């Protein structure tokens, strides 16, 4: 049996890791295809190293672009690869444009499609990821859900129970696996008592007004804050000339994106 994984961003690499370990344990051949949606080394390559995942056989190198551009590039480049590799099944993860593009492509080729982290819903149709996850769920042959709520969501949408499999939260599985190995790492690099902050959602970086509201909110917090700066957030803060304000907040420690192991340590130690 040969299984193909299609991934494109950091959360998907994390979800892939525990699934890959199980496939290897059962001596199932696997192929990893990286769409290249995250192409910065700190945002991509380091995760494969730290999670001990096999390097991708192929990187589509789609880079950034509009939702339609990225989705179309992935579909056009992926189709031939899937046809040549002839996998017995394809696994997609989460709710990115990579997930959407892969789900459409694989479904049209009539190859069994498995969706890990299926059934999650925000019921906010303006959210791009919500659109992606709904389409991926309804095209998938088997849907691996993290919890009962997700399973119920799928049943309400008419998906038969025999296609829904309760797998639990693979992200949490990987967190427990990693933290057991790296509990004492990075001592001294960060404050003893801190709040961990990430900031990258499209709706939170879409306007100067929105960014200023978030800055005003964190300025009222009297704890040390460790902000992991996403490239998108870095770009818009620069475009709106707000770096001086960011630097004036003495409680705010801004750091570049970190690898997965370091992130699990930060999560384990933060307030």
Identify the residue ranges that each predicted region occupies.
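Structural motif
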Residues: 2, 88-89, 194, 271
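Short, glycine-rich nucleotide/cofactor-binding loops
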Residues: 3-13, 200-209
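Active-site and donor-binding regions of nucleotide-sugar-utilizing enzymes
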Residues: 4-9, 13-22, 47, 59-158
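A short, Lys/Arg-enriched amphipathic alpha-helix followed by its capping loop at the start of a domain
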Residues: 19-28, 217-221
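Short internal beta-strands
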Residues: 30-37, 143, 225-231
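A nucleotide-sugar donor-handling region in carbohydrate enzymes
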Residues: 38-42, 61, 139-210
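N-terminal beta-loop-helix "entrance" segment that forms/cooperates
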Residues: 38-54
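Donor-nucleotide binding loops and adjacent catalytic segments primarily
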Residues: 45, 181-269
């Amino acid at each position: 049996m040969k299984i193909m994984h299609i991934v494109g961003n950091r959360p998907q690499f994390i979800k892939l890791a525990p699934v890959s370990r199980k496939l290897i344990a059962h001596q199932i051949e696997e192929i990893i295809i990286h769409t290249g949606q995250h192409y910065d080394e700190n945002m991509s390559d380091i995760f494969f190293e730290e999670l001990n995942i096999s390097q991708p056989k192929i990187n589509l190198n789609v880079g950034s672009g509009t939702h339609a551009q990225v989705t179309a590039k992935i579909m056009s480049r992926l189709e031939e690869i899937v046809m040549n590799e002839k996998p017995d099944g394809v696994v997609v993860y989460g709710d990115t444009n990579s997930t959407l593009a892969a789900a459409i492509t694989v479904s049209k080729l009539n190859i069994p499609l498995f969706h890990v982290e299926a059934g999650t819903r925000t019921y906010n149709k303006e959210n791009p990821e919500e659109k992606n996850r709904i389409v991926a769920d309804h095209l998938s042959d088997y849907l691996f859900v993290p919890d009962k709520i997700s399973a119920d969501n799928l049943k309400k949408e008419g998906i038969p129970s025999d296609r829904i499999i309760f797998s639990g939260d693979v992200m949490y599985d990987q967190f427990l696996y990693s933290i057991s190995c790296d509990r004492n790492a990075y001592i001294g690099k960060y404050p003893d008592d801190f709040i961990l902050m990430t900031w990258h959602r499209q709706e939170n970086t879409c306007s100067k007004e929105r960014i200023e509201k978030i800055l005003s909110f964190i300025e009222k917090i009297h704890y040390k804050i460790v902000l992991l700066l996403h490239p998108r957030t870095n770009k818009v803060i620069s475009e709106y000339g707000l770096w001086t304000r960011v630097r004036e907040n003495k409680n705010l420690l801004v750091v570049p994106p970190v690898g997965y192991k370091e992130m699990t340590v930060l999560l384990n130690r933060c307030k």
